[in-house]
Regions:
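Exposed, interaction-prone extracellular/peripheral surfaces
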Residues: 1-176
């Protein structure tokens, strides 16, 4: 799932940075915190891609200090894209928190399709149970008005981005 997440983040960064939009990066989990401050252009894309190339799997699975800080410092004028296999509910909790602050948030689900293909029956059952819990958590996030989109390639976000653009032109209710 790390490979899918990094590829998805790279495609999204390329889409926005090369069109003059400001792009930043903050890892949410993992062994080492990675952050790239906001900027635009090809040089920024290179910085983001170089930083993502250094991301290592593992860690506690919880949010890194840089990820928590980036989420707290995000402003309402940005669209925040959270990419995760959504194994832990913490990313979804962060998405709901940002949405309640009035931010445009999209969650990209990068869990591979083959995750429950195990020879061990107990492992397969454990995965099925976790995936049922995960499905319930995703429904709750969707109910809060935050789209969760399965990553299927660069075109995965087209409709969601159009919907968010339409929503951001109207009045918004922000809970404080």
């Amino acid at each position: 799932s790390l490979d899918i997440t990094v590829r998805a983040a790279g495609a999204i960064a390329e889409h926005y940075a090369t069109r003059g939009e400001r792009v930043s990066l903050a890892t949410f989990g993992g062994r080492v915190a990675h952050a790239v401050p906001p900027a635009s252009g090809r040089a920024q894309l290179r910085r983001v891609l170089d930083r993502m190339a250094r991301i290592q799997p593992g860690g506690t699975g919880g949010p890194s200090a840089a990820g928590r800080l980036a989420v707290r410092q995000s402003s309402g004028s940005r669209m925040t894209v959270l990419l995760s296999p959504l194994i832990s509910p913490e990313v979804l909790d962060q998405a709901v928190s940002l949405g309640r602050r009035g931010m445009a948030v999209v969650v990209i689900d990068t869990l591979p399709d083959h995750v429950i293909d195990h020879d061990d029956d107990l492992t397969a059952i454990a995965w099925r149970i976790r995936l049922l819990e995960r499905r319930r958590e995703i429904r709750m996030v969707n109910g809060a008005g935050i789209p969760v989109v399965r990553w299927r390639g660069p075109g995965s976000l087209d409709q969601v981005i159009r919907d968010i653009a339409r929503r951001t032109t109207g009045p918004r209710l922000v809970r404080r």
